Amino acid sequence: MKIIFDHSQGHVINDRVFCEAFVIPENETYDDLIELGWLPNVQPPIYWYQSQSCRINNSKISLSYKRRKIISQLEYKILQYEGIEEEVDSFFYDYFDNKKLDLKKFYDLNSQFSNIQVMKVTKDDKVVGYTRFQNLTRNNLGMETAYDLNFPRLSLGITSILLLSDYTRLQNKNNLYIYESYNDYFPYKMEIPGIEFWEGEKWVSNNIYK
């Protein structure tokens, strides 16, 4: 891999230098890179950045009775994003608007990735959520989740991620990766059963953050 250090926004705090690190893959696969904490970003070409990535370790998941009861009320299907873009995009755009999230530009940029699949979640035949993800060889990489805000008791954000993690397990794959996990931006990820974080050298349990 070709490593790039971006000093354009770099700075020094207490005599420590902070800058961004990126890589352009050479012979590495997607799985190789995400297993080492790198995350893809669409650029010409695709470059990968280092962040506090997180993943769901299925062997460490322990679901509460409440969560199991919620999951029992839901069904999901795995579909190709290509061909249902209009339906999925409309659901996501409405979700962004209702949550007042300025994410449409990033969502559209991510739509340029190849091999995007969609998990469609339903309750009593009504669509209550979508999650887009990339189906890799050894793992899956979750991208974005949107859900119906009229079902707060279902905790559909976390529940959708757990459903996708279970689908990953049923595929006999290793883990579901779900991008960054910084607590000031993604506090809900700290609550996901089985969550692990990339600390720069190895994967660690969320217990060290409690």
Regions from the language model: what does each represent?
Residues 1-75, 79:
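Acyl-donor-binding surface of acyltransferase catalytic domains
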Residues 16-30, 115-116, 127-197, 203:
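Acyl-donor binding region in acyl/amide transferases
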Residues 36-37, 95, 99, 192-196:
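Alpha-helix boundary/capping residues
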Residues 39-40, 102, 174, 195:
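Short coil/loop linkers at secondary-structure junctions
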Residues 44-46, 66-153, 183:
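A conserved beta-strand-loop-helix scaffold within acyl/acetyltransferase catalytic domains
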Residues 52, 187-188, 208:
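Short Asp/Glu-rich motifs
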Residues 52-54, 119, 176:
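Well-ordered beta-strand positions enriched in small/hydrophobic/aromatic, beta-favoring residues
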Residues 201, 206-209:
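Long, intrinsically disordered, low-complexity Ser/Thr/Pro-rich regulatory/activation regions
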